[in-house]
């Protein structure tokens, strides 16, 4: 009787982990232009064809590594108010993304423009964070703005100014954006 082979992605996950780890280490040490697929493959213990098959090219690999670095490790901070939650999310976001490392991560994500997969994942991280904040607001009896509107009013202007480097996106600017939001409507209490 033949044994059933169970493939839960173990080997695939190990390969991805090894390639990502080597790529991150090389990016920390070397200029991007000095990093090659064969270099990554050798240090990760895989063949270059494995990397090309999975990621297509080095730009897509950099984008995949950037997405992994940008993945949130926790839900947005719960401050007890929608404004506080948005501020606690937005200020560190702007600081991180406007740093040299953050700017490079943005460039890496945008390198994958052919498929848009990397950018889509990063965008979803933001929507997920705003959805958590909105759920908390509703639990407090508030009617929050839709996540799409928060992206348009908060995240989009920050990213625009980061990409075009035409102004600082520090705490004062982030608070100005927050001040421009319409007030969160309190849900009417239903008499029991």
Task: Show the residue positions of the predicted features.
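Basic, helix-initiating cap at the start of DNA-binding domains
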Residues: 1-43, 49
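Hydrophobic alpha-helical connector segments
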Residues: 74-103, 151
């Amino acid at each position: 009787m033949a044994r059933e082979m169970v493939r839960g992605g173990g080997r695939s996950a190990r390969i991805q982990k090894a390639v990502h780890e080597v790529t991150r280490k090389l990016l920390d040490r070397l200029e991007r232009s000095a990093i090659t697929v064969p270099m990554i493959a050798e240090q990760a213990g895989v063949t270059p064809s494995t990397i090309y098959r999975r990621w297509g090219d080095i730009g897509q690999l950099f984008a995949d590594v950037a997405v992994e670095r940008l993945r949130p490790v926790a839900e947005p901070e719960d401050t007890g108010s929608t404004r506080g939650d948005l501020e606690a999310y937005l200020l560190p976001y702007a600081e991180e993304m406007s740093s040299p490392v953050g700017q490079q991560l943005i460039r890496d994500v945008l390198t994958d423009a052919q498929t848009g997969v990397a950018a889509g994942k990063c965008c979803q991280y933001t929507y997920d964070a705003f959805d958590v904040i909105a759920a908390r607001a509703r639990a407090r009896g508030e009617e929050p703005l839709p996540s799409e509107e928060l992206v348009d009013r908060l995240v989009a202007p920050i990213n625009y100014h980061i990409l075009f480097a035409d102004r600082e996106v520090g705490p004062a600017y982030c608070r100005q954006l927050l001040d421009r939001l319409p007030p969160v409507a309190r849900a009417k209490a239903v008499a029991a």
